[in-house]
């Protein structure tokens, strides 16, 4: 889950924008259709409130800063993202949270499922 700035439209979709390291930086990444590596993110609006949107995100690829860059690319940057949206008005960290995770157990193969409630600093901005 992520909280982004703005009222997300359309409410669901897939972002297919390749990513690469930003020229002159060892940290920042950017959308780069000429030289970037494939990056795919599926998103779905969960809730809009007070000029922010709570978004569920699912990655098909796992590029560095993928969620942060893809949401900024759509025009809805993560709040609290000091690198790509330096606005710390509502939260002092990236408003990004791993709410639900599933993967096979490495030995038994049994599906393991984990969930974690939205942290209080994020739920103070948008409640689930």
Regions found by a protein language model. Name each.
Residues 1-128:
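RNA pseudouridine synthases
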